[in-house]
Amino acid sequence: MSYFRTAILLAGLTGLFMGVGYLIGGAAGAMIALVVAAATNMFAYWNSDRMVLSMYGAHEVDAGTAPDLHRLVAELAARAALPMPRVFLMDNPQPNAFATGRNPENAAVAVTTGLMQSLRREELAGVIAHELAHIKHHDTLLMTITATIAGAISMLAQFGMFFGGGNRGNNGPGIIGSLAMMILAPLGAMLVQMAISRTREYAADEMGARICGQPMWLASALAKIDDAAHQVPNREAERAPATAHMFIINPLSGHGMDNLFATHPSTENRIAALQRLAGQSGSATPDPAPAPRGPWNGGAPRRGPWG
């Protein structure tokens, strides 16, 4: 998805929010909704990373407590021309990961213990590179904004349904139209949020593959994580499904294929896209970029920068 289309979708979310506000309080309600949207996004801008990391019980690690992971993130961040993000570990058996933070200078990468135990070093590099791609694309802020506005639309619509719309003049939509809008607006907001999330995943897959130098490392990791996500529950994510879009693979049980209600593209489609990228880049041959010494290898030259 182009950034222009993303901007259009964000504008649509804001318009939905103002529309619900209008149905409740007329023009004044629309303006109040706009102010509320700005205020909630400002709060999310400064606090969302701490909130989500705390929600998942993530604890920060460093070169002393998790040297291999920390060194891998540092090397990949340097390769991506990014500041070193903070690194967090979640005590969770489901292999998964996400990135958060308002900008690259205040970003964090969080991985589960299940991910560390399930993946080979090359696959872990692919996952970390994918999360760094989200940071590089400023997707962490984008998804925070969309989730915040979508949540506010649902909350405001519920408020309107409980108290009834206040804009019922002759030129208004009437009570039936108001109720329909208040029911459909949250659904529309969710669809827009999911559309943005799904397409940003494709962009992060491509950039992540270029950062680590081997698209198939990420493809292999996605297959393993997706298989495990169907079998290993993520209880924290089940309690907070609004955060599911943050993860590299949908952490919720029962997630389906590539459809309007999916938080992520289907894993099969993502792997196919990475396979096409591998064919275009000729990644079956050694990566043309200089290969830095990786955290797990013994210095022997292998395919790609870490394997």
From Swiss-Prot:
Q: Does the keyword Membrane apply?
A: yes
GO (cellular component) term, any one: plasma membrane
According to the UniProt record, where is the region Disordered? 278-307
Mention any Pfam family matching this sequence: Peptidase_M48
Q: Please give the InterPro entries that the UniProt record associates with this protein.
A: HtpX_protease, Pept_M48_protease_HtpX, Peptidase_M48
| Cited CDD domains | M48B_HtpX_like
What EC number(s) has UniProt assigned to this enzyme? 3.4.24.-
Give the binding site residues for Zn(2+): 130, 134, 201
Signal peptide feature range: none
Record's subcellular location: Cell inner membrane
> How the protein sits in the membrane?
Multi-pass membrane protein
Cofactor(s) listed in the protein's UniProt record: Zn(2+)
Gene Ontology molecular function terms on file: metalloendopeptidase activity; zinc ion binding
Q: How is the cofactor bound?
A: Binds 1 zinc ion per subunit.
Active-site annotation: 131
Q: Entry's PANTHER family?
A: PROTEASE HTPX
Q: What family does the database annotate?
A: Belongs to the peptidase M48B family.
Write the protein's name: Protease HtpX homolog
